[in-house]
Structures are given as structure tokens and as C-alpha cells.
């Protein structure tokens, strides 16, 4: 298996929002360029070590919609969410990856912006 840093590089130039957190601490370990840009960050160093809920949702406690306890390596959970911080409707795909070198698990979230495609029938769940 590739090293985790090689996996992060794969996401770097994607046109989707991608971030990864340490599943145990909620600390951000990776954000791709698009995600850094939408949150007004200059580099990954500006995000690393910060709690995902503090940076991405501007809250002091883990999000009520956090699905970390339902994620598994190799399987994706797909859901829709309106993010008021960035004012975008997103289709989210979440999974876990495991670092074969040390056994650590990371939550990876890929967000596809569906703001322009969203339908009028309320398929987007707002929290």
C-alpha cells in the first residue's frame, strides 16, 4: 500500500473539497488546495493540528452530524449537507484509510459542490 503522504498528493489538484483528520483526535492532517482556498488558508500548516469542527464548522464541540463512528476502511458513506460557513451545498463521501506503517486511521471526506445542480424537492439535508 502507498504511504499516506502519497495518498494526500493524489487529492491535491482535485476540483472537489478534500480533507482528512485523525479519527481519534479530530485534528486535521490534510486539506487539498481547493479546501484551503475556500476557507481562506494559505497553506496546510495553517490547518494542521486544528480540530475539524473548529476550523470547518466554527464550533467548539464535535459536530452533531459527525459520522466517524459509522466509517469503515474501504467503504464510503454518502450524504448531502448545506455548509453555511462556505455557503455551498455538498454531496459528501466519507471513508477511513489506514496507514500501513503505523496502523493509524484517518477520516477522509470528499465534497462535491452540487449548489448549482441541487433540486427543488429538498434532497439536501440542512443541519
Predicted features along the sequence, with ranges:
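Sensory coupling linkers of modular signal transduction proteins
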Residues: 97-127
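Polar/charged side chains located within well-ordered beta-strands of beta-rich proteins
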Residues: 21, 66-69, 93-94, 107-111
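Terminal output helix/cap of sensory domains in signal transduction proteins
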Residues: 50, 55-84
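A generic fold-level signal
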Residues: 13, 23, 47, 87, ...
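PAS/PAS-like sensory domain cap-loop motif
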Residues: 35-47
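Per-ARNT-Sim (PAS) sensory domains and their PAS-associated C-terminal
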Residues: 73-75, 79-93, 98, 103-105
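Residues that scaffold the ATP/ADP-binding catalytic core of kinase and kinase-like folds
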Residues: 38-39, 55, 120
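Sensory modules in modular signal-transduction proteins
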Residues: 1-26, 31-36, 127
